[in-house]
Structure formats: C-alpha cells, structure tokens
C-alpha cells in the first residue's frame, strides 16, 4: 500500500457553540487507502468528517489536502477539489428517478458527452443503477438508496470519498454488499475515509485505523493492529472486559 500522506490533520481543534469536540487532533490519511475512524459515541468522529467537507470550521489547526489547507474553504470549494461526503442520512430526491439522482452527481461537469460516459461506467459498477434506472428513488429500500448515493458521489470522480456511518439501518445482506462496494471504490482509485458503527468489519477492509477518545487521537495503526488491540477491542469493538483489564494491567507494568 502506498503511504503518501493525502490528508493531514495538524493540531485541529473544532466544535460547536457548547465547546470543543476535537482537541488537538493530529494524524494523516494515506493516499490510495481506506482509513477507518472508530471510538465511542461523542468522541468527535462525525465532527472530524465534517471538518474535511467544510461543514464544520476548525477553531485552530490545519487540514492539508493535495498541498492546500482546507480550513476556511466552503463546502462547494472543497467539493470542486475532489472531496465528496456521503451523508449519514439518506439524501436522494425521492420523486426523481434513480438515473436522475445519479446524474446530479456530475453537476460540476457541463460536457454532456462526459456525463454520459461516466454514467455508463457507473451502470457497470452499480447494477442497481441500470436495473432501476427509471424507478423513483423513493421506491427503493434504505440499502438500495445507500448504493445509489455511492454511485452518485462517484459521478464527480472524487479523489477522496468521506463516508459517515454508511451501514446505518442496513440489513445483513445489504451490509455485505455495501462493504464490497467500499472495497470496489477503493480499488478503482478512490481514497476512502470513513466512520462506521460496524467497526470490526470496517477495520478488516481498512488499511489504516484511528481511534478517537474524548476528541483526541488515542491510537493509530493498520486496520489489523487496531482490530487486534485487546484494550481497544474490549472498549469499542465488542470485546470482553477481561481483555480490557488484562491489557490495561500489562500496559501499567510495561
């Protein structure tokens, strides 16, 4: 895997009116990989993603992407730079067809021939776009809508895809398809940064993992290293309390 820093967080402090949620966050996202952020509720995971897409402006610090500081740039400017975020909540226009929704992803492109070529590639990558092209988006299940949202974001041909809890509300069958789709997007050349409630499954396909706790980076490593850490596994990934206690004891005596 390439290890070239693609996105770099340096001393990022950000939050809302009630105070700081992110507290001096430092880490890098490697180019060409999948990076998964895990941690307890309220640790700042979704806020971190919003700083990348311009929805939350850091109070302090810098976020570098391809040689440019994202801090202070609008969401539209960031979109034009090649960063697309798929929101946690479904965002399709229910009364428009699947194909119309997907085409909206290319709104920055004015050449109709280019749009048609992209749409043809998307149909190949996402069978649902071809099979349900003329159906209203509102007729799709939640999982099907999520796949169409993935397809729409790729119409922009982004360099970085940001995913906030993409598996939320999905049934086991669609969940499997969703993770396979994330892997496919990455293999197609997209760098992926995601927050995912099914952390174990997400870390298995991730090249890198970041653990947030109380707005700070507690641990970084490969996806496998984070997954195999007994203390992290017990606290955030559904492991046993005995594992956490044993890991903490060993750490205290090391």
Stretches with model-predicted labels:
Residues 157:
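Conserved catalytic motifs of ABC-family nucleotide-binding domains
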Residues 17, 73, 98-117, 125-127, ...:
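ABC-type ATPase nucleotide-binding domains, specifically the catalytic core motifs of the NBD
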Residues 153-154:
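ABC ATPase C-loop
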Residues 53:
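Helix-to-loop junction immediately C-terminal to a conserved catalytic motif
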Residues 136-140:
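Conserved ABC ATPase signature
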Residues 61-69, 81, 115-119, 221:
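Conserved ABC transporter NBD signature motif
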Residues 38-40:
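The feature captures the beta-strand-to-loop junction immediately N-terminal to the Walker
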